Amino acid sequence: MTLPSVSSAPSADGVWHNCHLLPDADPAHAIRDAALVVEHGRIAWLGATADLPDAYRGAARHDAHGAWITPGLVDCHTHLVYGGQRADEFAMRLAGAGYEEIARAGGGIVSTVRATRAADEDTLFAQAAARLQPLLAEGVTAIEIKSGYGLSLEAERKQLRVARRLGEHFGISVYTTFLGAHALPPEYAGRADDYIDLVCNTMLPALAGEGLVDAVDAFCESIGFSIAQTGRVFEAAARHGVRVKLHAEQLSNLGGAALAARHRALSADHLEHLDEAGVAAMAEAGTVAVLLPGAYYFLRDTNLPPIALLRQYGVPMAISTDHNPGTSPVTSLLLMMNMACTLFRLTVPEALAGVTVHAARALGASDRHGRLEAGRVADFALWRIDSPAELAYWFGRNPVATVVRQGRVHAHEGASA
C-alpha cells in the first residue's frame, strides 16, 4: 500500500462527531458520546457532544461512525533509515551462530554500514518510506529516527537528511537522533578513542550546526562503547545544547542508565540488565525507560527489564519498535504493545501510556504529542474498536479507520471520514 504525501491529503478541519475520546492513556478520562473540533489544523475543542459550543454547530462534519479517537501514537526509538537487510544473518543465528561468528562472516552491523554507505539518498528514502508506511497506517504520528549506520560524517549526514525528508513528505513529526557512537567503523578498528574524537569534534558539531540533530545517543556496552567514551559523547552534546538518550543495560550492566541519569537524559533504552541503583537514578533524573520487546523477542532473551522496580520508583515506561535490520525488523507498534503486555507484563493502561504520553516524554515532546488537548496540532487516530484495551489485545490485526496527521486526513481501507 502506498500512502499519499501530505500535500494530497484533505484538511481535518471541522467537527468530528459520533465518537468516543481517550484524551490520554487514563481510562478514567475517557469521554463517551463525544466530539472533537479541528480549526486551522489544530484541536480547538473536545468534550461531550452535548457540550459542543454553539459556535461550532455549523462547521463541517466528520462522522466517526462510533470510532474511538486516541492521540496519535509515538514510536520513540527506531533505526528506520539504512541500506539493505540481514535475513541471511537471521538464518545463521537460528542455526546457532553467535555474534562474533556472524561478524567474521561479514555480517552484523558492519554489513549494514557497507550497504548504507553505498546507497544514495533517494535509495535510502525509498527503502525507509516502505518501512514507515505500516507504522503510519497504525496511527503513528510522531517518530524518532536514529543515524548510526553511516559512521562517517558524510554517511551520517545522509541518514539524517533522509529522516528529515520523510517527515516533510509524509507530514509526520520526525525527531532525529545522532547515533555516531553506535559501533566502531572498520577503518577505526582498535582505535575506539580516536573514533570518539571524530564523533565529538567533527561529526556532532557539523551535523548539529546544520540543524539535523534533535538528540544524541550512544551504544554503551562491552561490544560498543565504554562508560568513559559515552560520557565524552554526552559532554560534547551538552556543549551544543542537545539532549541525550542511551542504549543501556541491554546485554550487561555497565552502569549506563546511571550515567544517562547524571546527564539528565531524555531516556535510557533496552534495560534488560538494569539494577535498582540505575532505576533509582533514572527516577531522580526524570529519565524515561524505553522498553523494546521486539529486540527481546528476536534475540530470544531471557532477562526481563525490572518492571516491578520501575513501577515502584515511578519511572515512566515507554514502548517502541526499535526497528532495525539486525535485532528488531518489525514495523508494528501495536504488536509491540501486545508484546509489552504478554512478555513484560505491562498493564493495558501502561501500554497505552507507553506509546503516547510516555513516548512523547522520551522525545522531549510532551507539549506536542501524546495527548488530545485544545491548542495542539491535530494528530489523532480513529479506531474501529469497542474499547481502547483492544489496541494491546489484538496482534496481526490493525483496527485503525482513519489517521489525522498535522491536521490532514489519511483514510485507510474500510474507513470513511
Curated annotation (Swiss-Prot):
Cofactor or coenzyme needed: Zn(2+); Fe(3+)
Predominant location category: cytoplasm
Transmembrane segments: none
EC number: 3.5.2.7
Listed Pfam families: Amidohydro_1 (PF01979)
Binding positions for Zn(2+) per the UniProt entry: 77, 79, 247, 322
Record text on cofactor binding: Binds 1 zinc or iron ion per subunit.
Keyword Ion transport: no
Binding of N-formimidoyl-L-glutamate, residues: 149, 324, 326
Residues the record lists as binding 4-imidazolone-5-propanoate: 86, 149, 182, 250, 327
Binding site for Fe(3+): 77, 79, 247, 322
Domain of life: Bacteria
GO CC terms in record: cytoplasm
Pathway, per record: Amino-acid degradation; L-histidine degradation into L-glutamate; N-formimidoyl-L-glutamate from L-histidine: step 3/3
Sorted UniProt keywords: Cytoplasm, Histidine metabolism, Hydrolase, Iron, Metal-binding, Zinc
GO molecular function: imidazolonepropionase activity; iron ion binding; zinc ion binding
Function description: Catalyzes the hydrolytic cleavage of the carbon-nitrogen bond in imidazolone-5-propanoate to yield N-formimidoyl-L-glutamate. It is the third step in the universal histidine degradation pathway.
Recorded family membership: Belongs to the metallo-dependent hydrolases superfamily. HutI family.
Protein known as: Imidazolonepropionase
